Amino acid sequence: MDASPRSRLSRMVKWFWQRPQTGRSFALKSRDAASSSTKIDFAELAPGIDTFLGQAAYLQLGYFETLSQLITSTPELAQKESLSRAAGAAYIKHRDLVALIRERGDEPTALMLPFREQLDAFRTATHGRRTEETMLTVHITAGMLDDFYLALAHSYGDTGRRVARILQADDDRDAIVTILTAKIEADQEWRSLLGLWGRRLVGDTLLVARAALRSGH
């Protein structure tokens, strides 16, 4: 019987933290020097509701945009179809968060705009040179930040509960795990490359979470 998406993801995470093998390797994008902080105290992060909603909505829009770009750059039809499902899921989450913001009497663009520059810079910095790197970027950053905002949602009463339901909807990213797992299992060089890239993404995602949430103070 095939491994579940969760077990495949666990294997990928394990690979990320194994020491890369020596030998020929691909070059990675350089990391901005501003990403050098090492530890984050999540207990200190408590943004206002407008900050929380604006960031959550804009993040989903960013996932949708990146996945849409991946559809264009991916040659295989089956992979395009899988990516289109993931893009559609991100769009639905964005749409539902925007609807919630409007129900509260606020203008979605006004809440999202303060975080556009910062979050766009994060997306640019974590956009890989290769399609597979960017697939991994979406899978790791979206997964971590969705979980992070889901945990924060419990601080915002009924509005937070509604946000939690939106974020808990199916993200349709299982196919990305399948694609990347096949690539890693078939090629030692890709295993090393994506392992390094994955570790970098974890650190950068924690940094953007801290910076974005503290901007609400």
Model-derived regions, located:
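C-terminal accessory extensions/subdomains outside the catalytic/core fold
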Residues: Q21-S35, V208-H217
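Acidic/His metal-coordination segments adjacent to aromatic residues that form catalytic metal sites
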Residues: W17, A34-G54, P114-V138
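Alpha-helical scaffold segments that form or flank carboxylate-/histidine-based iron centers
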Residues: G48-L53, L77-I92, T134, D158-A175, ...
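Inter-helical turn/loop segments and adjacent helix faces that build the functional surface
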Residues: Q69-E81, Y149-R165, L180-S192
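An amphipathic alpha-helical core segment
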Residues: R165-H217
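Active-site-proximal alpha-helical scaffolds that flank and shape metal-associated catalytic sites
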Residues: T109-T178
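Conserved alpha-helical segments that form or flank metal/cofactor-binding pockets of metalloenzymes
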Residues: L9-G23, A86-F115
